[in-house]
Curated annotation (Swiss-Prot):
Keywords, alphabetical: Hydrolase, Metal-binding, Zinc
The protein's name in its UniProt record: Lactamase-like protein nscB
Superkingdom assignment: Eukaryota
Essential cofactor(s): Zn(2+)
Biological-process GO terms, alphabetical: secondary metabolite biosynthetic process
Annotated residues for binding of Zn(2+) 2: 218-219
Entry keyword Signal: no
SUPFAM superfamilies assigned to the protein according to its UniProt record, in alphabetical order: Metallo-hydrolase/oxidoreductase (SSF56281)
Function, as annotated: Lactamase-like protein; part of the gene cluster that mediates the biosynthesis of neosartoricin B, a prenylated anthracenone that probably exhibits T-cell antiproliferative activity, suggestive of a physiological role as an immunosuppressive agent. The non-reducing polyketide synthase nscA probably synthesizes and cyclizes the decaketide backbone. The hydrolase nscB then mediates the product release through hydrolysis followed by spontaneous decarboxylation. The prenyltransferase nscD catalyzes the addition of the dimethylallyl group to the aromatic C5.
Note accompanying the cofactor annotation: Binds 2 Zn(2+) ions per subunit.
Family: Belongs to the metallo-beta-lactamase superfamily.
Binding site for Zn(2+) 1: 214, 216
Catalytic center residues: 218
Length: 439
């Protein structure tokens, strides 16, 4: 089944599932909805607005999600309040979401073009992504629902396998005694809470701490179920940028139980609040969504994400326990692969723009331009590709790289229609001047 979601920038921010556009008062009742991110306040959009953007985006994490179940969130006040699936009133900010594509929305909303007038539209073909990601999903190794991955770490799957979650969200019980640490709570599906509750009961295990790597719903969704099972856990939930009633996590904070000393490591980039956790007894790192067991992750802020990957590498941890996928037996190698992958893409794009600048300067009289549009950059690197591949698969990530190169003073752009925007490599002397270095 094909469906469309349209992206639009204006003064508001809401996500409307295409199936619910009519209920939410879409201008056209044609199965289309709108994603309307925060108004652009700088040439590089929301990259400089991460704190506010995180507050708005964190409404996603409040959704009680089962497959394609929809939730409506009212965020008019500083705290987010779940209102159920009622029709919106007045000027409420509302979120209609299909959970299967939360991470896609998360990675693209900063970079998609605003278009003409009050906002342009970029169609999102759901079937394209489902076909692309289902192929990757089919190649994954099978993981058991519960497995002892080390002497002090037990992995319990969240029961939410899918194209965006690989085999499902990994949740971890850490420690060797009766008292344990739980890292992440999965999506909030009944299969997970039933599984972990039964395991805790039969093994006579109690939870001393519940640590959340970040705000995304497939990591925080099980919190209400845990508290419903055991109300005393309400005081034991820890998260960076905590929600009401939760405890904060700070960089370097230590959480200790028998057989496990866990240190919190602030690693923003995938999300603004992302934390990893270092298990000192094993020299192992719970990598959250920054590094996955299979394939590559996505980043909200590419610059901070790259810094976090390097910070993670500097820890020297041997083993990685990712939030999705199998155990990473060679974490240093995986981190190097991630860094080289991202840096390689930066080098390719900068090289393409540099070649065009040199060519344009040499043939200026013949009308050869010095910059390239995004489509022309894709052509220079990958050759001719179908438009839907460029728009749906490449544009979001490549735009993210261009904005990072802009922040690094390596690339500039000419203002104008984002769809036709010219990007160009800065000369070395201009790069030095922009960075405050002597020419």
């Amino acid at each position: 089944m094909k469906s469309r979601v349209y992206v639009r920038f204006d003064r508001g921010f809401h996500v409307i599932c295409p199936y619910q556009a009519k209920l939410a008062g879409s201008r056209k009742n044609d199965g289309a909805g709108y994603i309307s991110p925060l108004a652009l306040k700088s040439p590089i959009g929301l990259q400089h607005d991460l704190e506010d953007g995180c507050r708005i985006r964190s409404a996603f994490g409040k959704c009680i999600v089962n497959s394609r179940f929809l939730a409506l969130i009212d965020v008019r006040k500083s705290g987010f309040k779940e209102r159920g699936s009622k029709e919106p009133h007045g000027n409420s900010f509302v979120y209609w979401v299909t959970y299967s594509f939360l991470q896609f929305f998360e990675t693209t909303m900063d970079e998609l073009p605003s278009g003409r007038g009050m906002g342009g539209r970029l169609p999102f073909n759901q079937s394209f992504w489902e076909e692309f990601l289902s192929g990757r999903e089919g190649q994954l190794p099978t993981l058991p629902d519960i497995s002892h991955v080390s002497k002090s770490v037990i992995r319990i799957l969240g029961g939410n396998p899918g194209s965006m979650h690989l085999q499902g969200t990994n949740t971890y019980l850490v420690g060797t005694g009766r008292s344990r640490i739980l890292i992440d709570t999965a999506q909030g599906l009944p299969v997970w809470i039933d599984c972990i509750s039964s395991f805790l009961h039969t093994q006579k295990i109690e939870l001393s701490y519940v640590l959340l790597t970040h705000w995304h719903g497939d990591h925080t969704g099980g919190v209400p179920d845990l508290i419903a099972q055991n109300s005393s856990l309400a005081d034991k939930i820890y998260k960076n940028h905590p929600d009401s009633g939760q405890n904060p996590i700070t960089h370097g904070q230590i959480f200790s139980v028998d057989g496990a000393t866990v240190r919190a490591i602030f690693t923003p980039g995938h999300s603004v609040d992302h934390m990893c956790f270092l298990l000192e007894e094993e020299n192992a790192l719970f990598t959250g969504d920054n590094v996955l067991g299979h394939g590559f992750s996505v980043a909200q802020d590419l610059g901070r994400y790259m810094d976090s990957l390097r910070d993670m590498a500097s820890l020297g941890c041997r083993i990685g326990y990712p939030a999705h996928g199998a155990v990473i037996e060679n974490l240093p190698g995986k981190l190097e692969e991630y860094i080289q992958h991202r840096e390689g893409r930066e080098r390719m794009m900068l090289s393409a723009l540099t070649r065009q600048r040199v060519r344009g300067e040499g043939l200026r009289e013949e009308g050869v331009k010095c910059g390239l549009t995004l489509n022309e950059i894709v052509m220079a690197i990958y050759g001719k590709l179908p438009p839907e591949v460029i728009e749906k698969a490449l544009a979001p990530s490549l735009l993210q790289v261009l904005w990072k190169l802009t922040e690094d003073r390596m690339v500039g752009f000419k203002p104008g229609d984002p769809l036709k925007r010219q990007w160009f490599a800065l000369e070395q002397r201009k790069r030095n001047k922009a960075r405050g270095y002597p020419s």
